[in-house]
């Protein structure tokens, strides 16, 4: 027998009553009771979720005996009930340390304004003559650019900042004029990079913004597959690579090819910059003014912060916000007239199908900046807006007495995990679960992760399996073993990431060479940002409702990304999470990063990896910790 209690408000109460009246007897104005099968209960939950809104709050209690009931699930607003499903009769205000973020989002304002300001400059380089001719369908122009638009944008931003401090260039941006950028250093024309490094001499916040401008499509990679270049720098030089080894060729792989040299001067011939657009200048003034007030970065202590190298969380969440915004706005079919300067003529991209010019450059920059700021604001709310694992007896019940000898260790492990739950909120968690085959590690892993979530009450985790084959069948067996539904556990299968991440060096160079050639065709339209985030062969088995969350406005158009994100538990092979650290271009890191940002991580039997793969595994563990995940290694 079960009892339903509805604490719904407004129209949601009537919708809830219609659903529950069809399955149970109403025993009060907001309560129902009935005898029901497990399948029937699952159907009720599914129907309630389908009609749920922010005003919905329904709890279901299983009457176990005359003196005991157990909370089965809650649909909707969990704040209407406590952890046992009881309805509060009074409220008390108190400072709850476990719900205050003292660590992860301290730099939320920096992320927000770094993303918004870099978005204003990220495509400045598209105003060059070669690019404008390339995307214009009425002109049969050369399709190649020696220097990519990101590199030219970087040089233009560097020219704007000059030798100013962060406070000074933000002040100038807040009152920018059409002639604030008159010229910039031209690689291949004015000399070598050693004569004028684009990053080294910038102040800390400007260096972060410049990096985002440079890396908004892809991270710099040395093209070691090209035969006309010096050998790739040694890994030993990694700490000082920006100062010693960095060059335009890391971004623009073809800039030193002989057949490109005749195009260089045209590449640097700039048409009207977005500075000429009153709409762009208005947006820049507004963003810079807010940033100058909100960001208290200019004390002597914080001026010494290296935002690019020492604040990886800030740098990469800013980049994620910028790339997700660029992808979102580039895909829009409707133009935004109020963001277009009436006399501004440069374009940012063309339509993939019709090949016709689509978004004006000033409109595109304003749109991406607008959405980047909103995405960065929404990121801290993402975890709280996603559904967590419902109370599950499989994870909380002790091992039966008859199985204590073989599986009793699970109870001890769960108890230890629960005891460090509060500590792990602030200090993180890395655990190793070692047990022989057949001792129930799979179930124990889930119990441990649920116990670690005791303090916050939010259990969400991803199980990353080794490179053995994961099929839908084995994934569904995993689901049954944990006693979870297809709404609570999603399975990611397919894709070619394994082959690409762990292939040998020769094959990797061959693939990079091929992709470098294909890259050019994608840039012909100026629409690289529309490329897919996820592998086209990836399939995610998830039957839950696609409910709203803080990033819904920017992810709802990507069904597979939504499915990867929404389920409380994800089971996949490890390569589907590896792009968080190994993905270098096209936003491939975004899906995995959002998953790690909103769930803990279980590395289950990573025995298929050799010593050569350990750096990639270590990067994944480091990244998970940086994004706030608790990590458990099971072997």
Please report, for each region that a protein language model flagged, where it lies by residue.
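SF2 helicase catalytic motif II
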Residues: 575-577, 589-623
């Amino acid at each position: 027998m079960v009892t339903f209690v509805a604490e719904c408000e407004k129209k949601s109460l009537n919708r809830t009553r219609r659903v529950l009246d069809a399955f149970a007897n109403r025993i009060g104005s907001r309560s129902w009771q009935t005898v029901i099968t497990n399948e029937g209960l699952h159907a009720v939950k599914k129907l309630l979720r389908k009609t749920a809104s922010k005003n919905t709050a329904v709890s279901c209690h299983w009457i176990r005996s005359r003196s005991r009931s157990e909370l089965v699930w809650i649909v909707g607003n969990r704040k209407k009930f406590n952890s046992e499903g009881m309805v509060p009769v009074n409220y008390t205000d108190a400072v709850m340390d476990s719900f205050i973020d003292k660590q992860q989002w301290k730099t939320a304002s920096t992320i927000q304004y770094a993303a918004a300001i870099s978005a204003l400059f990220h495509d400045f380089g598209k105003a060059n003559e070669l690019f404008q001719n390339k995307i214009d369908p009425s002109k049969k122009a050369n399709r190649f650019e020696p220097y990519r638009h990101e590199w030219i944008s970087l040089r233009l931003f560097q020219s704007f900042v000059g030798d100013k401090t962060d406070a000074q260039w933000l002040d100038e941006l807040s009152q920018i004029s059409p002639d604030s950028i008159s010229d910039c250093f031209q690689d291949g024309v004015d000399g070598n990079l050693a004569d004028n490094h684009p990053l080294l001499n910038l102040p800390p916040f400007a260096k972060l913004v410049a990096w985002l401008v440079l890396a908004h499509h892809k991270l710099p990679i040395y093209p070691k597959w090209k035969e006309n270049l010096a050998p790739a720098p040694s890994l030993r030089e990694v700490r000082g690579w920006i100062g010693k080894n960095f060059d335009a060729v890391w971004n623009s792989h073809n800039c030193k090819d002989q057949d490109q040299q005749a195009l260089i001067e045209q590449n640097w011939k700039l048409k009207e910059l977005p500075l000429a657009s009153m709409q762009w200048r208005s947006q820049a003034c507004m963003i810079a003014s807010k940033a100058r007030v909100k960001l208290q970065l200019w004390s002597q202590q914080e001026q010494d912060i290296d935002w690019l190298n020492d604040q990886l969380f800030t740098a990469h969440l800013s980049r994620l916000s910028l790339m997700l915004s660029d992808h979102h706005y580039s895909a829009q079919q409707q133009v935004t007239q109020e963001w277009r300067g009436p006399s501004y003529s440069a374009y940012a991209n063309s339509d993939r199908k019709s090949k016709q010019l689509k978004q004006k450059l000033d409109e595109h920059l304003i749109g991406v900046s607008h959405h980047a700021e909103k995405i960065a604001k929404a990121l801290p709310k993402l975890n709280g807006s996603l559904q967590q694992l419902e109370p599950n007896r499989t994870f909380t019940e002790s091992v039966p007495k008859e199985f204590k000898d073989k599986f009793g260790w699970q109870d001890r492990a769960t108890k230890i995990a629960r005891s460090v739950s509060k500590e792990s909120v602030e200090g993180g968690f890395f655990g190793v679960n070692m047990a022989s085959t057949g001792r129930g590690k799979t179930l124990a892993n889930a119990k441990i992760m649920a116990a670690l979530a005791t303090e916050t009450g939010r259990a969400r985790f991803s199980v990353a399996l080794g490179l053995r084959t994961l099929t839908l069948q084995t994934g569904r067996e995993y689901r049954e073993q944990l006693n979870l539904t297809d709404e609570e556990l999603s399975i990611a299968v397919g894709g070619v990431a394994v082959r690409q991440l762990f292939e040998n060096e020769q094959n990797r160079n061959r693939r990079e060479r091929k992709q470098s050639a294909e890259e050019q065709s994608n840039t012909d339209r100026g629409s690289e940002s529309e490329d897919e985030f996820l592998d086209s062969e990836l399939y995610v088995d998830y039957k839950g409702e696609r409910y709203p969350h803080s990033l819904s406005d920017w992810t709802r158009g990507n069904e597979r990304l939504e499915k990867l994100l929404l389920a409380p538990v994800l089971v996949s092979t490890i390569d589907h999470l590896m792009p968080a650290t190994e993905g270098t271009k096209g936003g491939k890191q975004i899906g995995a990063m959002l998953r790690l940002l909103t769930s803990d991580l279980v590395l289950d039997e990573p025995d298929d990896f050799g010593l050569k793969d350990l750096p990639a595994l270590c990067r994944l563990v480091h990244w998970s910790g940086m994004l706030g995940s608790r990590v458990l290694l099971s072997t």
